[in-house]
Structures are given as C-alpha cells and as structure tokens.
Amino acid sequence: MEFTSKSENPHFSEVWDLDPKEIQSKTAELTLIDVRRPDEFVGELGHIPGSTLLTLDQLPAKLDTLSKDDTIVFVCRSGARSAQATSFALENGFNDVYNMRGGMLLWNEYGLKIEK
C-alpha cells in the first residue's frame, strides 16, 4: 500500500491518510469500516460498496471483531471521525490501519461509485 500522506490534522500525526482514488482501485484488498451514523451511511453521500458500518461510538466495544491481519481503512463524512478511529486502532495494537482522506465528501467529489 502506498501512503498518500501523514494526516494533515496535528492531533493525529501518527495516522496515514489514503486518497479515495487509491482506495477505490483496491477495495477487494481492503477492509473498509465506515464509522458514521446509520442515517449517514444510507443518506445523501451513500457509502462505499462493500464497506461495513461500525459507528465510532461502537468501535471500542467491537474493535476485537476486526482482524489485525487485515488492511483496514476507516471512512467517515470528512475524515475527522475516521482519523479518530484509526488512531484508536493504532493505540490498540493494529498496525495496518489507515484513514480515508476527505471522507465521503471527497469520494463523492471524485464521482466514485456509492450505494445508498
């Protein structure tokens, strides 16, 4: 996996961001976790086909359901909540975890495929 950049948010300097176009071309190789609310997941911005909804507030209780062997990309609306999720996973022993830069806003701006 090529890194796009370190997170631009100084509070998450240990988090690597991946560009939506890079993610779109590798969705079969990735575990995509959407940390938005259920209404956002099916709302106007839709969600990435094949992604799994696991809200940010559920993450602490359900992190152990994710495999540390998988490459995980966290997704949200703009990239802020997913950066929090990525940071939390890193703090809890996950190594191959990333944040989708720009969230679903940028995904939609690029015109990439969504489901609602």
What do the predicted segments below correspond to?
Residues V75:
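Short, surface-exposed ligand- or partner-binding patches at beta-edge/loop junctions that are enriched
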Residues M1-T31, P38-T71, A80-K116:
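Rhodanese-like catalytic fold shared by cysteine-dependent sulfurtransferases
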